Amino acid sequence: MQKRHTFNTAQVMRRAEELIEASSNRYRITVQVANRAKKRRRLDNDDLEEGGMKAVMQAIVEMSDELAQPEIIGD
């Protein structure tokens, strides 16, 4: 039986594009997303199936929600 995901991949892609467009440095924002995903994966090691969303996608959603806070995008 196939699992149904509760997120829309098109929406995650749109949010990722918003993050990249809001950032002055594409490489830096990519590294920030990767670091946040790595941290989340370490912290949530016990709970592997949180909504069916992978750590990278969760990091993108979280960071795009925080776009109003420039310190997240800056350094």
Curated annotation (Swiss-Prot):
Its EC number is 2.7.7.6. Keywords: DNA-directed RNA polymerase, Nucleotidyltransferase, Transcription, Transferase. GO terms for molecular function: DNA binding; DNA-directed RNA polymerase activity. GO terms for biological process: DNA-templated transcription. It catalyses: RNA(n) + a ribonucleoside 5'-triphosphate = RNA(n+1) + diphosphate. GO terms for cellular component: DNA-directed RNA polymerase complex. Belongs to the RNA polymerase subunit omega family. This is DNA-directed RNA polymerase subunit omega. It comes from Cyanothece sp. (strain PCC 7425 / ATCC 29141). The lineage of its organism: Bacteria, Bacillati, Cyanobacteriota, Cyanophyceae, Gomontiellales.
